[in-house]
């Protein structure tokens, strides 16, 4: 899988995103879920994920948070409290650190990673993974993502693709259970049958 951006930017990216999560959650006192909502809906997440130098290595953690908050319209930079000096990494710092690494390694959106591994789950992995190296966190993400895909396909097969003997217009598929890439419109312009969606293998 192709990394999201040049590896030379990665060390700074990890430090800065780690600092952003630490500062936002511990110094600003933002709930994790709220800050993550701000982060993934801001341009910062997209541009950081593409390796734009201004964001991955041109801003500190505090500056990233200030920019995220500015873009989402919640606070001015002058409202941001000073960062507290720390002698060691916090759980939130580690979570931001491995999140930056995983996004770089897999080249997917931060939002996609956090859908597979919510922030609270990432924090709970700290005791077992913080000494194992960042690549082990990526392994956990890959395993969880693969399991989610299998479970999603299974749900689609059981509930959406099973024949319905009571319905003369079979096949009928619950489109909400099928990933868009696995569904296609089975109706044609010349068909008199009702419009339906069919799951593809």
List where the protein language model places each region.
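N-terminal interaction modules that seed assembly of large macromolecular complexes
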Residues: 7-67
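Alpha-helical residues within the helix-turn-helix
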Residues: 26, 161, 172
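Short alpha-helical DNA-recognition segment
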Residues: 39, 164-182
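Recognition helix of helix-turn-helix/homeodomain-like DNA-binding domains
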Residues: 50-53, 176-190
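Long, compositionally biased
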Residues: 53-87, 91
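DNA major-groove recognition helix of helix-turn-helix/homeodomain DNA-binding modules
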Residues: 65-73, 192-201
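A charged, amphipathic interaction segment
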Residues: 84-143
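Short basic helix-loop element that most often maps to the first helix and adjoining turn
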Residues: 155-169, 198
């Amino acid at each position: 899988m192709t990394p999201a951006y040049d590896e030379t930017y990665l060390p700074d990216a990890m430090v800065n995103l780690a600092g952003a999560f630490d500062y936002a959650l511990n110094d600003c006192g933002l709930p994790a879920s709220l800050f993550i909502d701000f982060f993934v809906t801001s341009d910062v997440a997209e541009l950081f994920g593409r390796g734009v130098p201004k964001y991955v290595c041109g801003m500190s953690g505090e500056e990233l948070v200030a920019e995220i908050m500015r873009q989402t319209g919640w606070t001015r930079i002058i409202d941001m409290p000073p960062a507290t000096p720390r002698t060691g990494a916090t759980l939130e710092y580690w979570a931001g650190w491995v999140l930056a690494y995983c996004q770089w390694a897999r080249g997917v959106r931060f939002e996609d990673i956090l859908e597979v591994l919510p922030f609270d789950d990432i924090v709970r992995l700290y005791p077992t993974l913080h000494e194992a190296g960042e690549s082990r966190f990526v392994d956990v993400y890959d395993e969880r993502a693969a399991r989610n895909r299998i479970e999603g396909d299974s749900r689609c097969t059981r509930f959406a693709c099973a024949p319905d003997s009571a319905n003369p217009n079979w096949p009928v598929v619950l489109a909400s259970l099928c990933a868009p890439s696995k569904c296609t419109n089975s109706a044609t312009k010349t068909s008199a049958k009702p419009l339906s969606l069919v799951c593809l293998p």
